[in-house]
Amino acid sequence: MSLAFTLLTSKDNTDEDEEHLELSSFNQEKLLEMISVFLSRLTRLNDSKQEATESDQIPLSPTSLKNPCLIFSAKNVPSISIQAYLTRILKYCPATNDVFLSVLIYLDRIVHHFHFTVFINSFNIHRFLIAGFTAASKFFSDVFYTNSRYAKVGGIPLHELNHLELSFFVFNDFNLFISLEDLQAYGDLLLSWYRQNGQNYNPTDVSCSIESPISHTPQQNQQDEQPRRPIMDRRLLSSHSIG
């Protein structure tokens, strides 16, 4: 059962006092913590599922544009926690709340696009995050940084980020548009879930070993046409979500 369905139909979330996340003013560090808690619990769940069903398999190197699990998988689980990774991204590549929240929605779309055969796990979550953030920053922001900066902040080679970003676009059907209503719905849902499930979370604050990036001048983004409006499924990483 999807997280969104669980929350929307539970008695605790049908009261008149509904949770509301103010996108423009919500504390960014708190938002990153909420996203991190959800993704950390999701990846642990999927890790255990894969260990039970694929105990004899190991992550493979990127070899195919058809399988995001292969393309985004690292050889080893990164030593930096999800929350520390997102905090690092925010520090060196500042962005608004809608950019970070949109990455969660894009991951949901990818999972749904591949008919729930994609596992968001500890081997691929960091690469999904940096690729999604790179794409979302260019779509939502008037200014953005070069891919060389995003790659350095993310701790991966530039050529690999370029490949991951293109794959991220492909897996989202080159459609990154998200309506304000859908952003708000996901934000409210995430806040509600966190207040019920995330209070006992203690993240492992592991610092990243790569050196701090140097300053780069942001590039202005020029959009000539309006993107088409997608049909939103409104499920948070539905295939393996946790309630």
Swiss-Prot record:
Any Gene Ontology biological process: regulation of cell cycle phase transition
GO CC terms of this entry: cell division site; cyclin-dependent protein kinase holoenzyme complex; cytosol; mitotic spindle pole body; nucleus
Gene Ontology MF terms: cyclin-dependent protein serine/threonine kinase regulator activity; protein kinase binding
One Pfam entry name: Cyclin
Region of interest (Disordered), ranges: 211-231
Keyword Cell inner membrane: no
Record keywords, A-Z: Cyclin, Cytoplasm, Nucleus
Assembly behavior: Forms a cyclin-CDK complex with pef1.
Listed PANTHER family: PHO85 CYCLIN-6-RELATED (PTHR15615:SF94), PTHR15615
Homology family: Belongs to the cyclin family. PHO80 subfamily.
Role this protein plays: Cyclin partner of the cyclin-dependent kinase (CDK) pef1 (PHO85 homolog).
Protein name according to UniProt: PHO85 cyclin-like protein psl1
